Amino acid sequence: MMSVQLQKQANAAAAAAASRGDGVAIPAASPTQVTDAITQVAESPALQNRAGDSESPYIQAHQDTPVAWQLLDKDAVALAKSQNKLIFMNIGFKACHYCRLTTQESFRNKNVAALLNSSFIPIIVDREERPDIDSIYMNYIQAVNSAGGWPLNVFLTPELEPVFGGTYWPGPGRSTSSAVEDGEEPLDFLGILKKLQKVWTEQEAKCRKEAQDIVLQLREFAAEGTMGVGSTEKALSGAATGTTVNVSTGVPASTLSAETPTKPATSSPLATDLDVDLDQLEEAYANISRTFDRVSGGFNLSPKFPTPPKLSFLLRLAHLPPEVGDIVGGPEEVEKATHMALATLRALRDGGLRDHIGAGFHRYSVTADWSVPHFEKMIADNALLLGVYLDAWLGQAAKEGRTPTLDDEFADVVLELGDYLGNTGSEIGSSSIRQGSLLATSEASDSYQRKSDKHMREGAFYLWTRREFDATVSSTEEGDLTNGKHDGELYARVAAAYWNVKEHGNIPEEQDPNDEFINQNVLRVVKTPAELNTSFGIAVDEVNQILAQAKKKLRARRDIERVRPDVDEKQVVAYNAMAISALARAGAVLRSTGLDKTRGGTWIKSAEQAARDIKAKLFDQETGKLSRHWFRNQKSSTDALAEDYAFLIEALLDLYEATGDESAHLDWAQQLQDKQIGLFYDHVAAPSGQSIDSEAAKTRSGSGGFYSTVEGAPNVILRLKDGMDTSQPSTNAVSASNLFRLALILNNLESSTNGTKTARQYDYDTLARETIKAFEVEMLQYPFLFTGLLISVVSARLGGQATFADVGQGLGVEDASNIIAREFACKPRGGLRALCIKRKDAVSEGVNVGVSGIIGGVEQLKTGEH
C-alpha cells in the first residue's frame, strides 16, 4: 500500500528526531507506485474541533488548533465510514517534547489542518488515558519497523485497521539536514498527508485488503501471546536489522529473533504442568549481562532507560532461595548481578536524568553516558525507581545482617523520592504534582524559562548557563558560608566542578541539531567531595556544606524566576497505585526502624489517603468496577484497564503489610482481584456455573492470563495480553504476583483461625500458574523480556513464606510482633513472602508470632530467604 520510496522518504524526514532518541516507524510494506499528484476529494460537511470535550489535558490542549479533532468514539468512526475517509490518529501525551513539537509545527499549520480536515477524519488519543489503543498501534509500528515512540501517528481504514504509520515527522518547510541514500528528498508532514490522500483515492481496495491481512496476522500473534516478541517482525516486514532501540520499551530490536516457537499442540494448563523452569532465570541473567554497559551502567547503547523491572530482577537474585543462585551460577554470578544493578543506580543518581536541584528523575537519556535527558518527569517512573532504590538501600544492610541506616548508600535518594511523591510539606516535596491526595501523571519536558518568554524550550526549567549558575551560587546572604572564609567565586567554581557546569555548555553538539542548547548545562555529578577537596584544598565537610547551599540557592532562583513545566493533571489509578506501593514499603522501613518515624508515618498516611480517595472517587460500590482516572473534580468515563486493577491490588497488599489493616486493605484487594479476574481473565475453562458462547470464544484464546481490555470494548480491534516488561512491569507479571500473594496470605490466615474461612470465588494459586503458562513458550525463548513473570516462576516452583505478627496494641509498639514487622519491612524484595497479621479469632496454640507458614510449589521451599 505504501511504496518503498515513501518508506525511505518518511524515515529520512524523521532522522533528525531519531538522533535525539525518538523512534521512527517504517510504513507498511507491499509496494505500489505513488505519484506526487493530489486528488481532490468531494467536499464534506465541515468538521468541528471536539478536543475541548475531552477528559484529557493532552487532548484539551489541541482545542485551539485549526485541526478539527474528533474523539475516539462511535460518532467519529461512523463519520469515517459514512464519508469513506482514512482516519488519521494521533496518539501522544502532554509531557512529550516531540508531541508538542508536532502540534506546533504541523497541527497549527493551516495547510496541514486544511488537508487533514478535508481528506481525513482526524482523531486524537491520549496514550495515558487509553494505553490499550496505544499498545495496539504501537505493536503495528514495531512490527513493521522494530522501533516506536511518540507521537504515534497512524492512518487507519474506517474500520480502524492500520494502513501506514510513523512517529515524529517534521512540519512543512522544516529542514531535517537528512536525505535518503538514493537521493530522494525527505517528506515533511504535509507531503506524507498528500501521499496518503493519493493512495487511498486510487488504491482503496488494495489498502483495505492489506490492512485486513495485517490485522489478521496481528490477531493471530495476539492469540498466541507472541505479540511484540519478534514473530511480527518477520511476518510483516522481514527480519529486523541493525540495533534500533525501541523508545517505547527500551528493548533492542536486534536481540529479537525472527523465529517464534510453535506452542505444543498438547500443552496443558494444569498448575503442575509448567515447561518454564528456574533455568530461564539463568538465561535471562546471561542475556542482560551481555547487554550491560560496563562503562556507564545501564543496558544497550542509546537511548537509555532506567528500566526498573530489569534492575529489580537483578537485585532480587541475591534474595531468592539458594537454589536459584546455584542455577544462575553461584554466589559470584549473583554478586555480578547485584553489581550491574548498583552500578546503574549510581549512574542514574549522579547523571543527567536526576533533577539535582529539586527531586525526581527524567524519563530517559539520549546518550549512553546518561548525560542528556529528555526532560519529562513521569510519576510512574519515579514511583518504580523509589521501590528499586529502596531495595538497593536495604540490600546492603541485609547482606551484612544489620538494620539499615541513613548513612548507607542510596538512603538519600530514597528520602528524596519519598518526599517528592508523598510529602508536599517537605523542602523538596512537589505540590505541583499532587492534586489533593492523588498524584498527577507527569511534568512536561518543555517550558518557558522566563515568564516573559513567548516560546517554550525543551528542558528550559532545568538548564543553566555558566554565567547564571555562578551568579546564583556566589551570591552572599547573612549566615552564608561565603561570608568570612572564602569569596563567592571560589564556591561557584567548586559547585561548577561538581556538577560539570562549563562556560560553553556541556551538551554535545551532535545532540543539538537545532542550536537550542548553546551554552546550556545539564547538571550531573562528575566529581566526589574528596576529589574536590584535593582540587580546591577545602575540607570535605565544608565541600558538602557548599554543595548543600548551592543547591538551596539554585532551587530558590529556579522557583522564583522560572516557569514550572506544565503538569498533566490526570490522576491515573495505575500510576498512583505504583506510588502507594513504594511509599507504603519505604514508610514502613523508616517508621519501624525509628530512623525517621515522622517522615515514615507521613508517607504511609499519604499512601493510605490516596487509596481511600481512589475508592471514594473512582470505585463504583454497586458494580465493583474502577474508572481509569480522575480529572478536574470528576471521574473519567473511561473504564479502568487490567493494569489499574493489578497495580492497585499490589498497592493494597503493600499497605496491608505496612499497617495491618485487613478490612481497609486486604479485603478490598481481594474484592478487586475477583473483579479483575471476572473482567479480564482468559479462562482456560469456563468458571463454575458459567459457559463461554461461540461469539465470546472469538475474543478469547482459552490459554490463561489477563487481557488488557474487557471483552467487547468499543473501538478495540485486538485484545492483547501484556506479559513483556518494558519501562514498567507487565500487567500479567504484577497480576501473577498478586495472585500468589493473596493465596499465601489468605491460606495462612485461614489456617490460623478456628474454622473461619474467607469466601473465595476463584483459586488464586491455580490462576497464577495458568498466567505464567500463558506466556511460557515466549519465556522459553526470550526470558530476558519477562523478568517480572520469572520471579513468579520461582514462586510456582519453590513456594513462599508467610510470617505472622500480632497487631496487639498497634504496630507502633515495640514488642515481639513489631520486631517481626520491622525485620519483614527491612528485607528487600526477593521471592514470594507475606506478612500476615493475626486475626482476633486466631487459635493461639496453632500460630505463634514469628512462626512462618509455608505454601509449596512444585518443589517445596526448604531453606533460604524469601
Tell me the role of every PLM-derived stretch.
Residues 680-731:
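Acidic, turn-prone loop/beta-hairpin segments
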Residues 575-584, 734-752, 759-764:
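Long hydrophobic segments that form regular secondary structure
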Residues 569-576, 580, 585, 600, ...:
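Extended, leucine-rich alpha-helical cores of fungal transcription factors
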Residues 568-617:
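Phosphate-binding active sites in nucleotide-utilizing proteins
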